[in-house]
Amino acid sequence: MLATAQVLLVLDTAVMNVSIGTLVEELDTEVVAIQGVITAYSLVMAALMVTGGKLGDRWGRRRTFTIGMAVYAVGSATTAIAPGVGVLLIGWSVLEGAGAALALPSLVALVAGSYQGRERATAYGVLGAAAGVGVAVGPILGGWVTTSLSWRLVFVGEVVLVLVILAGVRLLSEPPGPARRPELDLVGAVLSAVGLALVVLAALQASAWGWLQPRSSPVTPLGFSLTPFVFAGGVVVLAGFVGWQRRREEAGRDPLVRLAMFTNAPLRAGLLTGLAQNTLLLGLFFTLPLYLQLVLGLDAFRTGVRLLPVSIALLVASLAGASLAGRFGPRTVVRVGLAMIMVAALGVLAVIGPELAGAAFAITMALLGTGMGLVASQLGNVVQSSVDDAARSEAGGLQFTAQNLGAALGTALVGAMVLGSLTATFGARVAADERLEPALRADAAVRISAGVPFADTDTVRDALAAADLSDDEVDALVEDYADAQLVGLRSALLGVAALALAAQAATRRLPRRVDEAPTTEWSPDATSA
């Protein structure tokens, strides 16, 4: 039941991403509006996750999970009947995002309270598998339902599933929590929400606005993109949040986040590795659809089918993760998983081309899924086993906050790699293309230097044909652009492989054995003794 909730809470983001074109047409809006709705969902999740974890300690984990899922169901129902983008924003971005922020931290705390030892490790392996399968299956389900039926049916189905989950959650016992109901730090909640939202917004919009040099930035302070200013604003607010938490602790009042938690080495390692995992996951799932859909021209459903080996391997590896951790230890399993992700990224780099290398691509996808499954199967158990019952929801809030930050960073960093390499390579190809007149090459170089989007070659051809160029010139420019697409994707995949290698550093303080984590449990009482 809890695994079903985990799938549900990650599934519809993938569905929404593959339904953008249909939503634009049916809701009579623009692509930028739907992208704004998707961005807003991420912002709401990031802003409220820490507070959602604290509310789990205050209200009780089962009650908070129930409230979160109920809010999520209302959001799904609102989304299903949305007549326009405004209602879609309220239903999907605000209500579903807030519901997920309440439910997810309590979900992992409920698992921790329901299982012990190896059974807990197995349960978190199942949750990891559920989350990964939701991400990977989403494009298949979304593509099929959107193409054959209606995107609205996905959200109707979510309402039905939530009702089933709510009926089943009554069978769960309330796990142990804090001995005293903690006070809710409202000022801290606002500061953390604003700070995290600004940091995530900067990361998500960096590709559109530009990192430093402005692209489509709404304003250009001092001639720069808005991105660094939004990011710096978020950092300043978060610094204020940290200072406020210290002040409350010194006054003997409950903070939103106990800063002493970050001195817990296994917890810190679990959070950092979770951030790295989602950076890699979202970076790869940003890159792969670009190749399959915009380079090869596959539709959403066929794209999902090509990614199916990821889902299958991820499921198998996640379920096997608990037994592997019992034999080799969580640290070793995570390190092997990260190494497999690195090799898979290099493998995809080697096999992508103008034509799909079907068997080789499927093998690399299976390797990628195996690596992701090994990592995902360990981190929930590491985080929850490093704290005691009183801090589980708080740790869960931090866990999902780290994952949301990683997701935003993955999209931003890999997106910047793709577009930066695409622009540089396309400019170099055009400048060296002797099929083009010198005047055309010079003019194109100026236009390309401002940045080019990643689009399918048919769209590029139509745009060039409308620019009063000859057929030969259009053919040459399209060929140069197609070459630059592959170079851009390969550069990004090389970057992902490098990030996977760097992520090994975050694993240094992960437990070497499954039975090592409980002996390092952190308790809020320990810091106040």
Predicted segments with their positions:
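Hydrophobic/small/kink-forming positions within alpha-helical transmembrane segments
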Residues: 43-47, 77, 132, 136, ...
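Small-residue-rich transmembrane alpha-helices and their cytosolic helix-loop interfaces
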Residues: 6, 38, 42, 122-136, ...
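C-terminal membrane-cytosol helix-exit motif in multi-pass small-molecule transporters
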Residues: 159-178, 195-208, 233-249, 503-511
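Transmembrane-helix exit segments and adjacent C-terminal regions of multi-pass membrane proteins
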Residues: 1-2, 6, 242-247, 266, ...
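C-terminal module of multi-pass small-molecule transporters
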Residues: 55, 60-69, 78, 82-90, ...
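Transmembrane core module of solute transporters
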Residues: 1-45, 49, 150, 222-230, ...
